[in-house]
Amino acid sequence: SNWFKNFLDGKSPGEGFFIEADPSNDYSQVVRPRTSPLLAEVETQRGPSHVWCTFSHDQVDLNFADPRVLIEILKVIRHYLDAGISILRLDAVAYLWKKPDHSCIHAEETHAVVRLIRLLLDQFAPGTLLITETNVPNQENLSYFGNCNEAHVVYNFSLAPLLAHALLTGTSCHLKTWMMSMPPAPPSCTYLNFTASHDGIGMRPAEGLLSDEEQHELVTTIESFGGKISRRSLPGGEEKAYELNISLFD
C-alpha cells in the first residue's frame, strides 16, 4: 500500500501507521491465528525495523493507537457509506488493538472502536448493518453484540464445526446442546448461520463444545478425506488446528 511505502520512507501519510515491536520482548501471551512469526523485519529509511503481522508477513497490522489511523479508517468507511452500502463487515476485528502484556485479542479498546463505528453508522446511515467476523470460541464471539451498541449481526461460527462433527459421527448431541444453550440475539440484532466459508471450517469455535479428543478425531477424519488443515501457534510453541479446509461435498 502507499501507506506502507511511506512508512518505510518515513513520509506521511504512513509514518507511524504501522506497529513496530522489539523482537527481544516476550510475546508468548499473544493469541495467534497462524504459525508464521509474529514479527517481520523490514528495511526502513531509519534502518531495520520489526513490524507486527497477526496473519502473515504480507498483511502488516495498522496501529490504531495512533489517532491518525483511526481517522483515516473512518474516512474510508464514510466513503463506502456515501456510495450506499447496506452492510459493513469488520474482518478479524478481534485482533485490532495491541498492547504490552496482553493477549492482543478482544481488547476493550477493540470493542470501543467497534462501538465508534456502530455510532457512525447509526448516525450517518441508519439501517446500515454492522457485522463482525470473529472466528473465536462461542462466548467470546457473542461479546461483539456489546450492549446492543456493537454489531447488528454476529456470525454463528460454532455451527460449522458442530455440523461437520454431527455428519461424520452420526450423532447430533453436541450440536443440539449448543443450539439449546444459545441465547436469543439482542433486540435489533441477529445471528448469521453459515456452514462453511472461503476460510474453511474454524476449529476455535468448537473449543468448550467438543472435547480435545473429539476435535482431534474430527481433524484426523478431515485429513483422511484429503482436507488440508491450517494451524495456529499456541503460547508454549505447539501447534493446533485452526481451520479445516474442505467442502461438505468432499
Which functions belong to the PLM regions below?
Residues S1-D250:
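Active-site and adjacent substrate-binding regions of carbohydrate-active enzymes
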